[in-house]
Amino acid sequence: MATDITPSSAPQCPDHIVFEHVTKEFRTRSGTVRALDDVSLAIKRGSISAVIGHSGAGKSTLVRLINGLETPTRGRVLVDGTDVSQLSDKAMRPLRADIGMIFQQFNLFGSRTIYDNVAYPLKLAHWKKADEKKRVTELLSFVGLTSKAWDHPDQLSGGQKQRVGIARALATKPSILLADESTSALDPETTADVLSCLLYTSDAADDS
């Protein structure tokens, strides 16, 4: 049976994510650091986009602007036509629920089972227990970790941990999936495996 990874919300805008002349600066003890300088871009729904740059080039900052963890110093970041920086904390919650995030260092809960790690965002979204169980079961099958459901993260390889991260990021059927250097800690073979999983995810769902 195919796993449903289709976004739960319908498209609202052809350009899913838009940066309009975005500059982001940070103040440090040694002065102001400009992480992004007048960045403009548009990402269409259902597309795959990659940001390439050396360490410290502002890649992670760009990602954090999309999900509202950072706000622009100047310019606007729009998601489906909405200026993210103008949203209140309450209005930001449904937006963040529609954005999945895969981290470089996995960010799994070591004291929880693989099942519970994947179920975590569903609990935050107040899914019914039966729906939660069905969804987690589907996702663990999708990433090939059904037999690891009751293991803990320290029992998994790096590639398996990142597969858990992918499953967790897809749990609430987000329309946006952000991956912040999600393969940089993996060996080449495992990297190819994880990227194949992500490409299949994009092909199977109308997400960005």
Spell out what each predicted region is.
Residues D203-D207:
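A short, hydrophobic C-terminal helix/tail in secreted or cell-surface proteins
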Residues C13-S202:
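ABC family nucleotide-binding domain
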